[in-house]
Amino acid sequence: MNSSNLFYSNANSTLRLSYGNVKDYIPSDAIHYDYYTTIAGIIEKEDSTNEDFIVPKKLIDLYNDKNFGRYADSDGNLRVNFIDNNDITGGNSGSPVLNAHGELVGTAFDGNWEAMSGDIVYEQGLQRCISVDIRYILFIIDKYADAGYLIDEMTTVSYTHLTLPTSNDV
């Protein structure tokens, strides 16, 4: 180690700010990823023989009952994740994602594989930040964990007012 040298710190313990837009992702010809996923995708990938894809029965039941409550989008779907072109790095997992009005719309948790060079150079066409939609987080707290009392303790913005992620809105 060169203890006498100064190095830029990781995302830990420093204030970082990134901005971007919610966007679909088209990494190559004939491959297109929509800017959001829904709970239907979780159910479609369910595989009881693969530890990474086991879906708890209670979540399957909530899906089958379409018991999404106020967390459903205008089409009645429950969005789980969205992608945007924010510039993130290792250590950003859990960082808040705000919309243009300063409202919490999700939490960043990963980047896409094709943008692994993002720690060295930002590539707008490739770089995507994967975030958990705040509606899914609140749904899990309220409906899955039966901890609605925690939601009651929060000051939340009405979903009729909240500007939720759509293309060009983060």
What do the PLM-derived regions correspond to, one by one?
Residues M1-G91, L98-S158:
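Serine endopeptidase catalytic core focused on the charge-relay Asp
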Residues T160-T166:
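Conserved small/polar residues in nucleotide/adenosyl-binding loops
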